[in-house]
């Protein structure tokens, strides 16, 4: 059985993160993106955004480090919500999280900062690092 990540809207993701103690947000963009457009600000719900620089090289070493990060940072029953610019990298990150045993993985398909009006940056708190 192949389990696919659950697609979730940005506003629903924020609501979910605020209500579920075992939920975590993982931003899979690059450090350049984080610095230029900001990151999701979860301080109002007493949480921090987890940052994973996704790429530019996605080789075996990267995926081993990614797996180790997930296993050392979260419980496998936790709810992991992944976000990137437009929903593509976060989908891949969530698919691999499921492969590594984190079946409660979500993809914020509207992304952080894409062309549609429903993205995180337009509707939800942002902070700059």
Q: Where does each model-flagged region fall?
A:
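Rhodanese-like catalytic fold shared by cysteine-dependent sulfurtransferases
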Residues: 1-24, 31-79, 88-129
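Short, surface-exposed ligand- or partner-binding patches at beta-edge/loop junctions that are enriched
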Residues: 82-83
